[in-house]
Amino acid sequence: MTAVCQIVSTRADNLWAFETSDGRGIRKVVEYMFPVIADKRGWFLTPDVQYFDQWPVRQPSLVFAGLAFSRAEYLKMWLSLNADPGTEEVIRNFPIRQPVLWTL
Protein backbone atom coordinates (compact mmCIF):
# COMPACT_ATOMS: atom_id res chain seq x y z
CA MET A 1 0.00 0.00 0.00
CA THR A 2 2.86 2.39 0.66
CA ALA A 3 4.08 1.80 -2.90
CA VAL A 4 0.65 2.86 -4.17
CA CYS A 5 0.81 5.99 -2.02
CA GLN A 6 4.27 6.76 -3.36
CA ILE A 7 3.51 6.13 -7.03
CA VAL A 8 -0.03 7.51 -7.31
CA SER A 9 0.07 10.54 -5.01
CA THR A 10 0.13 14.00 -6.53
CA ARG A 11 0.42 17.42 -4.95
CA ALA A 12 -3.34 17.79 -5.34
CA ASP A 13 -4.16 14.27 -4.12
CA ASN A 14 -1.70 13.14 -1.45
CA LEU A 15 -2.61 9.60 -0.44
CA TRP A 16 -0.11 9.76 2.42
CA ALA A 17 -2.33 12.36 4.08
CA PHE A 18 -5.63 10.58 3.43
CA GLU A 19 -7.60 9.47 6.49
CA THR A 20 -11.05 8.00 6.80
CA SER A 21 -13.63 9.75 8.97
CA ASP A 22 -12.58 7.55 11.91
CA GLY A 23 -8.87 8.39 11.49
CA ARG A 24 -7.61 5.33 9.61
CA GLY A 25 -4.91 5.86 7.02
CA ILE A 26 -1.53 4.64 5.85
CA ARG A 27 0.26 6.56 8.61
CA LYS A 28 -1.50 4.44 11.24
CA VAL A 29 -0.67 1.25 9.35
CA VAL A 30 3.04 2.05 9.31
CA GLU A 31 3.01 3.18 12.95
CA TYR A 32 1.37 -0.15 13.85
CA MET A 33 3.83 -2.26 11.86
CA PHE A 34 7.07 -0.41 12.64
CA PRO A 35 7.62 -1.89 16.12
CA VAL A 36 7.05 -5.39 14.75
CA ILE A 37 9.46 -4.85 11.87
CA ALA A 38 11.99 -3.59 14.42
CA ASP A 39 11.47 -6.65 16.64
CA LYS A 40 9.17 -9.37 15.34
CA ARG A 41 9.03 -10.94 18.80
CA GLY A 42 6.46 -8.21 19.46
CA TRP A 43 4.02 -9.86 17.05
CA PHE A 44 1.22 -11.02 19.32
CA LEU A 45 -0.54 -13.33 16.86
CA THR A 46 0.49 -16.73 15.58
CA PRO A 47 2.98 -16.21 12.73
CA ASP A 48 0.94 -16.42 9.55
CA VAL A 49 3.65 -16.75 6.94
CA GLN A 50 5.63 -19.83 6.04
CA TYR A 51 8.97 -18.03 6.09
CA PHE A 52 8.49 -16.03 9.28
CA ASP A 53 12.12 -16.57 10.29
CA GLN A 54 13.41 -14.97 7.07
CA TRP A 55 11.56 -11.68 7.68
CA PRO A 56 11.95 -8.79 7.96
CA VAL A 57 13.93 -7.61 4.97
CA ARG A 58 14.43 -4.07 3.68
CA GLN A 59 10.77 -3.15 3.41
CA PRO A 60 10.29 -0.36 0.85
CA SER A 61 7.46 0.88 3.06
CA LEU A 62 10.07 2.12 5.52
CA VAL A 63 11.76 4.35 2.92
CA PHE A 64 8.50 5.64 1.48
CA ALA A 65 6.90 6.34 4.86
CA GLY A 66 10.13 7.66 6.34
CA LEU A 67 10.34 10.30 3.64
CA ALA A 68 6.60 11.04 3.51
CA PHE A 69 6.29 11.51 7.28
CA SER A 70 9.83 12.79 8.02
CA ARG A 71 10.53 9.83 10.29
CA ALA A 72 14.29 9.25 10.45
CA GLU A 73 13.83 6.10 12.53
CA TYR A 74 12.04 4.43 9.60
CA LEU A 75 14.96 5.21 7.30
CA LYS A 76 17.49 4.04 9.89
CA MET A 77 15.59 0.76 10.31
CA TRP A 78 15.46 0.29 6.54
CA LEU A 79 19.24 0.66 6.30
CA SER A 80 19.74 -1.95 9.03
CA LEU A 81 17.71 -4.70 7.34
CA ASN A 82 18.76 -7.38 4.85
CA ALA A 83 18.79 -5.85 1.36
CA ASP A 84 19.50 -9.09 -0.47
CA PRO A 85 17.42 -11.99 0.86
CA GLY A 86 18.28 -15.42 -0.49
CA THR A 87 15.02 -17.27 0.14
CA GLU A 88 13.04 -17.55 -3.10
CA GLU A 89 9.64 -17.01 -1.46
CA VAL A 90 10.87 -13.89 0.34
CA ILE A 91 12.30 -12.54 -2.93
CA ARG A 92 8.95 -13.17 -4.64
CA ASN A 93 7.20 -11.08 -1.98
CA PHE A 94 9.80 -8.31 -2.20
CA PRO A 95 8.96 -6.69 -5.56
CA ILE A 96 10.47 -3.23 -5.02
CA ARG A 97 14.12 -3.77 -4.19
CA GLN A 98 15.36 -0.29 -5.09
CA PRO A 99 12.74 1.99 -3.51
CA VAL A 100 14.98 5.05 -3.57
CA LEU A 101 14.54 5.11 -7.37
CA TRP A 102 10.80 5.59 -6.82
CA THR A 103 11.38 8.71 -4.73
CA LEU A 104 13.11 10.79 -7.41
Predicted regions and their residues:
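Non-catalytic carbohydrate-binding regions of carbohydrate-active enzymes
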Residues: 3-63
